[in-house]
């Protein structure tokens, strides 16, 4: 994870009191921190080096094009940047995030800004929260663009005071000195603010690549292959890293599939971690998976006292009072602390997502209709950034690590939602996540007891 932080100062107010808040995000990017002023815009970035660990990828990126200057920061990973670089001949090297401002320059020079926005629906594969500021030849701010990925895997908050400042930060704790209303920047949104004679703001929604209606598939053989391919593709994209990768393994089907498929793709033992209390069931099932896939497995135990002691920082870290999120965050916080302080891993693969995407909560058995189940699933995914997505991001980034969430990949979501809702509803014939499980049935990827382990 990285931390982005910026202020557009509209009326020359004294913003010195806000600058200390920039350092509240340091844990998100322990490798390099930079804060710079461009005209009336303050741009800060804390970097966790994952792709291209050299200083060449330190942000903010400053690009000069004819009579304009582009200043760009991004907390994200663009997994298909090499393909895009080759297609457009942009020469981004090994810096994945640099592809976005390079594409912006290319499209605004040759096509339109609307065509640039469409790339986020159709071409750019990854998760991101970014700020892009464009200055004219007189170094005046002419426009700026703020964007966040389709389900909000990467966090972003904003404060807008029409008379004084626009404020953007990866976490709310980067805005503690601001006494106005803090809002979460909406997932799946690109916002453009034009700053010429008068300010004009327009928002584009990126939902069409997953939330649009698609023809439903009911051929079970086709379903299994499509789901299997989508899962493998989503995981494969996230295995690209210049830093070591850890895998959280609870023994549930979600994290177990991520670990098992990754082990096959990598072709050598991976490093798995399970966290729990003595007597818990997760440890037993996680060990079963670890033995089956031959991983280097670590068990991290904590006591009730240690869990309670961590609560205060868990609440500060997750920035929520939601009791379910806090309860579920304690274990992830403690295992992330272990990985961050006792290993050299910097990327953490997690299994969040299928409960929402696949309608896997036990109450889904009682959905009144297939189509209400479909609607409910989409609503849960739209809100996942406030709950499980928040937990995965904050608990992992708290210790200078990056969480990757393959089951929130747009390809997987779109593929699973293309299954006819009548086949997705859990019942006496199809258990929850049936088609996710069925896609890997009979491959000896996981023990049958794990692959078909019912959600507890």
Regions found by a protein language model. Give the residues of each.
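PAPS-dependent sulfotransferase catalytic core
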Residues: 386, 447-456
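ATP-dependent adenylate-handling active sites, centered on carboxylate activation for C-N bond formation
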Residues: 8-13, 135-138, 142-145, 153-156, ...
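Short histidine
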Residues: 18, 64, 74-138, 248, ...
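N-terminal glutamine amidotransferase
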Residues: 1-73, 77, 114-218, 229-236, ...
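Short, polar/flexible loop-turn hinges at active-site or ligand-entry regions and domain interfaces
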Residues: 87-92, 108-111, 175-182, 321-322, ...
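Polar, surface-exposed loop/tail segments
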Residues: 33-36, 95-99, 432-439, 452-456
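Short acidic/glycine-rich loops and adjacent helix/strand connectors
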Residues: 33, 85-86, 289
């Amino acid at each position: 994870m990285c931390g982005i932080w910026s202020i557009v100062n509209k009326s020359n107010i004294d913003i010195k009191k806000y600058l200390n808040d920039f350092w509240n995000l340091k844990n998100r990017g322990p490798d390099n921190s930079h804060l710079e002023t461009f005209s009336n815009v303050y741009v800060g970035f804390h970097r966790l080096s994952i792709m291209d660990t050299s200083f060449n990828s330190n942000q903010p990126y400053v690009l000069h094009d004819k009579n304009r200057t582009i200043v760009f920061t991004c907390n994200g990973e663009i997994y298909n940047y090499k393909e895009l670089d080759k297609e457009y001949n942009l020469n981004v090297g090994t810096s994945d995030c640099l592809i976005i401002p390079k594409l912006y320059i290319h499209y605004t020079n040759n096509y339109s800004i609307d065509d640039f926005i469409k790339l986020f629906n159709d071409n750019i594969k990854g998760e991101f929260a970014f700020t892009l500021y464009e200055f004219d030849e007189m170094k005046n701010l002419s426009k700026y663009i703020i964007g966040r990925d389709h389900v909000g895997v990467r966090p972003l908050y904003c404060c807008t005071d029409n008379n004084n400042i626009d404020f953007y930060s990866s976490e709310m704790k980067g805005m503690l000195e601001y006494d106005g209303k803090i809002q979460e920047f909406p997932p799946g949104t690109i916002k453009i603010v034009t700053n010429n004679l008068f300010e004009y703001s327009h928002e584009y929604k990126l939902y069409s690549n997953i939330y649009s209606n698609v023809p439903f598939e009911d051929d079970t053989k086709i379903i299994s292959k499509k789901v299997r391919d989508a899962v493998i593709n989503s995981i494969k994209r996230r295995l690209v890293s210049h830093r070591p990768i850890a895998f959280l393994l609870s023994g549930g089907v979600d994290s177990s599939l991520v670990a098992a498929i990754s082990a096959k793709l990598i072709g050598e033992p991976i490093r798995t971690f399970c966290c729990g209390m003595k007597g818990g069931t997760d440890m037993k099932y996680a060990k079963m998976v670890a033995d089956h896939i031959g991983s280097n497995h670590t068990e991290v135990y904590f006591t009730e006292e240690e869990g309670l002691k961590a609560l205060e920082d868990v609440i500060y870290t997750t920035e929520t009072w939601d009791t379910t999120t806090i309860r579920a965050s304690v274990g992830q916080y403690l295992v992330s602390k272990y990985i961050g302080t006792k290993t050299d891993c910097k990327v953490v693969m997690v299994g969040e997502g299928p409960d929402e995407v696949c309608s896997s909560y036990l109450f889904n058995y009682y959905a009144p209709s297939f189509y209400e189940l479909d609607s409910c699933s989409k609503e849960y995914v739209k809100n996942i950034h406030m709950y499980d997505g928040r937990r995965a991001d904050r608990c992992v980034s708290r210790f200078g690590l990056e969480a990757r969430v393959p089951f929130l990949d747009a390809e997987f979501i779109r593929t699973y939602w293309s299954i006819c809702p009548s086949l997705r509803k859990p019942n006496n014939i199809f258990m929850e996540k049936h088609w996710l499980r069925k896609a890997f049935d009979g491959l000896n990827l996981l023990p049958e007891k794990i692959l078909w382990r019912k959600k507890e």
